[in-house]
UniProtKB/Swiss-Prot annotation:
Naturally occurring in which organism (per UniProt): Thioalkalivibrio sulfidiphilus (strain HL-EbGR7)
HAMAP family: Ribosomal_uS7_B
GO molecular function: rRNA binding; structural constituent of ribosome; tRNA binding
Keyword Ion transport: no
Name of the protein this chain belongs to: Small ribosomal subunit protein uS7
Family: Belongs to the universal ribosomal protein uS7 family.
NCBIfam families membership: rpsG_bact
Listed GO biological process terms: translation
Key words, A-Z: Ribonucleoprotein, Ribosomal protein, RNA-binding, rRNA-binding, tRNA-binding
A Pfam family matched in the record: Ribosomal_S7
Amino acid sequence: MSRRSEAPKRQILPDPKYKSDLLAKFINTVMKDGKKSVAERVLYGALTQIEGKKGDGIQVLEQALDNVRPRVEVKSRRVGGATYQVPVEVRPVRQNALAMRWIVDAARKRGEKSMALKLAGELMDAADSKGSAVKKREDTHRMAEANKAFSHYRW
């Protein structure tokens, strides 16, 4: 373990269009190679697509995140030469980060034409509790449930 103190959390600026911290975080998750304006265009395009089909885009985004957030995950723990998958609860900040990452990863694997359409599709699916990101969460929960016997190895 490092003896250095934990780095202070930097304050994230809200996004310029909706003034939302959540959207700013999501834009940063979508961003590749530091191209923030491209990531903004993708996310705002996805929200516009959602508003055309389902109504309020931000509400759909929040519902999607809520449906994808994992409550528990497994961490590897080595005990006497054997490695156990130990279920641990996920902190709220990490829950959000994982949910965003899983949604973006699932969207990138979809077949639609543009990234905005892929992201819109994945967000709408996640809001309806279906799609790859929700499946990933279910798999994570299933793994934790299967390894419940090793929960006493928690640290």
